[in-house]
């Protein structure tokens, strides 16, 4: 049965789930969520898709699951890939997913939105400046963790890597330049070399160009 992922191209959290599905080899298809026209805020979406009013949402037959980290864990369990080779690795993957959700993706997603998807006169520069400082610290942690190693956990790509790269391939500015972090730069090349890898706007429907 084909898994369905409610998602949209601009969403780094959707990209984490989509890329896990893509690299796992499971059969899946994207279902476009028109976030910028308010679809996730409609009563119908809350009733029929996700009571939390968010994307991504994974649907596997009669079962549905929300939150990118939970979806990634489900994909690993279902496919036998990306989830580590032993309990210690699985916990270490979880540690990185939780760190990413709190320290990296939450800051990157909000900062990218404020810097690119709000009208220029509505962009809160003080908030953006604060966020950029937090992001620089997070990038430094990630870059240090990759010193002397190819992957964050174990000897192959895992959901730890996919979670932490979720926003880093986007072209819009949000305080990240690969050349400033050589270990991250090389790591992103390794991820992009994985069979089936695609960039966010190639993997999922929806992009800023659609609204231009």
Q: What is the meaning of each model-derived region?
A:
Residues 35-36, 160, 205-206:
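Conserved beta-strand edge residues that scaffold enzyme active sites
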Residues 197-212:
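Terminal-tail/helix-coil boundary detector
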């Amino acid at each position: 049965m084909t898994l369905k992922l409610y998602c949209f191209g601009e969403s780094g959290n959707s990209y984490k789930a989509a890329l896990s599905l893509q690299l796992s080899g499971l059969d899946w298809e994207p279902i476009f969520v028109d976030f910028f026209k308010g679809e996730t805020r409609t009563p119908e979406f809350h009733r029929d898709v996700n009571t939390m009013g968010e994307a991504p949402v994974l649907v596997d037959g009669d079962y549905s699951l929300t939150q990118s980290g939970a979806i990634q864990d489900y994909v690993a369990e279902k496919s036998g890939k990306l989830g580590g080779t032993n309990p210690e690795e699985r916990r270490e993957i979880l540690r990185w997913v939780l760190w990413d959700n709190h320290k990296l993706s939450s800051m990157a997603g909000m900062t990218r939105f404020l810097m690119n998807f709000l009208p220029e006169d509505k962009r809160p520069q003080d908030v953006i400046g604060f966020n950029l400082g937090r992001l620089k610290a997070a990038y430094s942690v990630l870059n240090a963790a990759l010193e002397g190693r190819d992957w964050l956990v174990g000897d192959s790509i895992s959901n730890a890597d996919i979670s932490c790269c979720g926003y880093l391939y986007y072209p819009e500015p949000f305080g990240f330049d690969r050349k400033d972090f050589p270990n991250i730069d090389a790591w992103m090349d390794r991820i992009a070399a994985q069979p089936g890898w695609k960039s966010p706007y190639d993997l999922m429907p929806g992009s800023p160009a659609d609204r231009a």
